């Protein structure tokens, strides 16, 4: 009779864990972080002057380039991220100790029992440690995202922000870009590489079946967490 409550408790715990694991799998595997809100600085619209030849307002440049320079302009960011990192660590420690105690003597006569050196003793110890570790990581991202100029700083730099959301058959893919661009780095085709975006925040993630298939289950996450005894 004493085993029935414990067996029932074990079955209940397994059922609750499976239910919680199903709830986690049904949700988003990698929730997207919201972009930090940036309040655009909008320049006041100049009122037209009746009867004047010149009216202040946005200029219509017929001969210059059309690169982004004002708040609300669009700019294409070419994602050319390519990072590689590797690290190797080797540690080797060894130590050996030996202690030899010879037979003591009394007035020049060795102390023995029936001719046996019972007081003579020797000990030795040997300790060693050898550890090796290797790690390597490589990331590569290519593509393009068109962003919006949110602010124009006093020095002429542009604060940009934007995202691209792709709705695919097996889920969603989202790319977010945020940072600061120098106006001189913008190419004539109104594009800039991501390597020249200062304070860049580039996020890429997904939702759906493909993203869930690459995520560990709740039991695997437990054995890979700090709570695991193994």
Curated annotation (Swiss-Prot):
GO terms for molecular function: cytoskeletal motor activity. Residues 1-15 form the signal peptide. It is a lipid-anchor. Transmembrane segments: none annotated. A lipid is attached at residue 16 (N-palmitoyl cysteine). GO terms for biological process: bacterial-type flagellum-dependent cell motility. A lipid is attached at residue 16 (S-diacylglycerol cysteine). One of its GO terms (cellular component) is cell outer membrane. Keywords: Bacterial flagellum, Cell outer membrane, Lipoprotein, Membrane, Palmitate, Repeat, Signal. It is found in: Cell outer membrane; Bacterial flagellum basal body. It comes from the Bacteria. Assembles around the rod to form the L-ring and probably protects the motor/basal body from shearing forces during rotation. The basal body constitutes a major portion of the flagellar organelle and consists of four rings (L,P,S, and M) mounted on a central rod. Belongs to the FlgH family. This is Flagellar L-ring protein. The lineage of its organism: Bacteria, Pseudomonadati, Pseudomonadota, Gammaproteobacteria, Lysobacterales. The gene is flgH.
């Amino acid at each position: 009779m004493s085993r029935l409550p414990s067996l029932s408790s074990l079955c209940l715990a397994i059922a609750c864990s499976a239910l919680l694991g199903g709830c986690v799998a049904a949700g988003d595997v990698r929730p997207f972080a919201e972009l930090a809100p940036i309040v655009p600085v909008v320049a006041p619209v100049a009122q037209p002057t009746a009867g004047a030849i010149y009216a202040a307002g946005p200029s219509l440049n017929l001969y210059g380039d059309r690169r982004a320079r004002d708040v609300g302009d669009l700019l294409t960011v070419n994602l050319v991220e390519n990072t590689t990192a590797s690290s190797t660590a080797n540690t080797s420690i060894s130590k050996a100790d030996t202690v030899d105690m010879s037979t003591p003597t009394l007035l020049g006569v060795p102390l023995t029992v029936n001719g046996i050196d019972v007081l003579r003793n020797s000990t030795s110890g040997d300790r060693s440690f050898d550890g090796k570790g290797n790690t390597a990581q490589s990331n590569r991202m290519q593509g393009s995202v068109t962003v919006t100029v949110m602010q124009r700083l006093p020095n002429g730099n542009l604060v940009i922000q934007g995202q691209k959301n792709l709705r695919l058959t097996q889920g969603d893919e989202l790319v977010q870009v945020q940072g600061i661009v120098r106006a001189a780095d913008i190419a004539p085709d109104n594009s800039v590489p991501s390597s020249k975006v200062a304070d860049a925040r580039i996020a890429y993630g997904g939702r759906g079946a493909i993203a869930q298939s690459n995520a560990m289950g709740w039991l695997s996450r437990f054995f890979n967490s700090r709570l695991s005894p193994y």
